[in-house]
């Protein structure tokens, strides 16, 4: 007969050992989030495509949020891996997923609704929500003026929460939330008159106003708010504590302020250059560097006046300028480009011009053979400005739209779409300030035409010196920019 008591001596030791193992294993803590990040050697971060957060340009990855979080990853001694979210809901849903991002760095503002999903770090930037309207339209002055206006904001944003609260007081306020756009799209829609108003943070306005000349700030909607990073909800404070310590450190040592100055501290818009000013620059600045333009242009088989026009557009023929993104010198070379072109000192005008000439020739050589002159030159200039990857994206989009990807006239219509989510989401290299290369090329072509004209033997000398220079119209819709020193 089966007897349970007969089994007890046989399995007693096994049961005791098993129970002891389970008890001990329960006492072993799993690695916390910070420990896992260090063990993996990777900090996974989710963000948004925006000039104020993260995007890729000819310098590579850049943006205020990117630089701030890259320094954090460097402090941890790990690699930074960036992922971009399709919209705000997607961003918050990604944080804390298994093998997913452990941190969201995207200019986020805390709210009671968001605190149900994530936990926020200490603040690193103060921003103010601003109502944006189109110049020439009636300017709203208070919340009551929002009634009857066509308004759009990002879905899931704190701005949508603000409008929802206002609607309780002003039931006539109507607004649309969209997850198919980004802030740049909203500003463009106001600029083009597609919507009447939008609500965005002041830092986004500062970063984008130069590209959308029709937008204006109507008024601030509420007080300044704090932007923070976000981590997953829960009781594991390891990563959050490390983030707060890091943000406190960069606040105290000045790193944070330097980043703020780089991205938000300058209104680096030159404005329209009149004939007299341009003539003065031709007389006072160009002669210092003309021999270098001619020598290196000849060596690289490009027109020296085209090379000089690039230098004027980039720096106004000033050798010691540095932009907010770190490009430097007369030809405004990135560090990577300078190294690749054999430039050891970007502030040396001779070296800078040499690097610019080699880089322009390199850009032309990289283009498909199907692109013929003069389009080949304009494509090379666009690649010089925005990078060959984004240019290739625009050419592919042009082909899909039934346009000729080898003609600048067609591709320049497509490039601005790279700043619109519905288009850049379909590309390999993502968001770009696609309007910049269009204006870059247009201005250089005009400067080139001017230089070609005034450097004719019969026009050199007195006419330029006296300022008797007829300057063809420079694109006023997108002024040239003079990089401001850090």
Curated annotation (Swiss-Prot):
Keywords: Cell outer membrane, Cell wall biogenesis/degradation, Lyase, Membrane, Signal
One cellular-component annotation, GO: cell outer membrane
Domain of life assignment: Bacteria
The keyword Metal-binding is assigned to this record: no
The EC number(s) this enzyme carries: 4.2.2.n1
Span list, region LT domain: 268-486
Non-LT domain: annotated segments: 30-267
GO MF annotation terms: peptidoglycan lytic transglycosylase activity
HAMAP family named in the record: MltF
Name of protein: Membrane-bound lytic murein transglycosylase F
């Amino acid at each position: 007969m089966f007897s349970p008591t007969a089994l007890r001596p046989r399995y007693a030791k096994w049961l005791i050992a098993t129970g002891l193992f389970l008890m001990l294993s329960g006492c072993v803590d799993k690695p916390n989030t910070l420990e896992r990040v260090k063990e993996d050697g990777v900090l996974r971060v989710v963000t948004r495509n925006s000039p104020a957060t993260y995007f890729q340009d000819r310098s590579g990855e850049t943006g205020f949020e990117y630089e701030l979080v890259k320094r954090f990853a460097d402090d941890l001694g790990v690699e930074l891996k960036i992922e971009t979210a399709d919209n705000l809901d997607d961003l918050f849903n990604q944080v804390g997923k298994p093998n997913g991002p452990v941190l969201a760095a995207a200019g986020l503002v805390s709210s009671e609704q968001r605190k149900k999903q994530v936990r926020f770090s200490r603040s690193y930037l103060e921003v103010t929500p601003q109502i944006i309207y189109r110049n020439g339209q009636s300017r709203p002055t208070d919340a009551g003026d929002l009634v009857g206006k066509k308004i759009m904001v990002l879905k899931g944003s704190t701005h949508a929460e603000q409008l929802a609260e206002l609607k309780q007081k002003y039931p006539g306020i109507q607004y649309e939330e969209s997850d198919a756009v980004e802030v740049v799209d909203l500003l463009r829609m106001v600029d083009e008159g597609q919507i009447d108003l939008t609500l965005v943070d002041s830092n986004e306005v500062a970063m984008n106003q130069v590209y959308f000349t029709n937008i204006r700030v109507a008024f601030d909607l509420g007080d300044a708010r704090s932007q923070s990073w976000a981590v997953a909800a829960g009781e594991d404070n390891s990563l959050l504590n490390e983030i707060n310590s890091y943000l406190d450190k960069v606040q105290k040592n000045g790193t944070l302020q330097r980043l703020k100055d780089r991205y938000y501290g300058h209104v680096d818009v030159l404005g329209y250059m009149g004939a007299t000013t341009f003539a003065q620059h031709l007389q006072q600045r160009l002669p210092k560097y003309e021999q270098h333009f001619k020598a290196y242009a000849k060596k690289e088989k490009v027109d020296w006046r085209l090379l000089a026009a690039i230098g004027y557009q980039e720096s106004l023929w000033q050798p010691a300028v540095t932009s907010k993104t770190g490009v430097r010198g007369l030809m405004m070379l990135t560090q990577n480009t300078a190294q690749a072109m054999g430039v050891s000192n970007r502030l040396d005008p001779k070296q800078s011009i040499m690097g610019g000439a080699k880089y322009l020739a390199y850009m032309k050589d990289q283009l498909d053979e199907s692109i013929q002159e003069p389009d080949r030159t304009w494509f090379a200039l666009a690649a010089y400005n925005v990078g060959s990857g984004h240019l290739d994206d625009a050419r592919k989009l042009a082909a899909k739209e039934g346009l000729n990807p080898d003609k600048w006239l067609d591709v320049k219509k497509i490039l601005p779409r790279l700043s619109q989510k519905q288009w850049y989401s379909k590309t390999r290299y993502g968001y770009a300030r696609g309007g910049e290369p269009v204006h870059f090329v247009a201005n250089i072509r005009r400067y080139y035409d001017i230089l070609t004209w005034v450097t004719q033997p019969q026009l050199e000398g007195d006419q330029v010196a006296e300022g008797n220079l007829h300057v063809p119209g420079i694109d006023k819709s997108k002024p040239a920019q003079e990089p401001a020193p850090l």
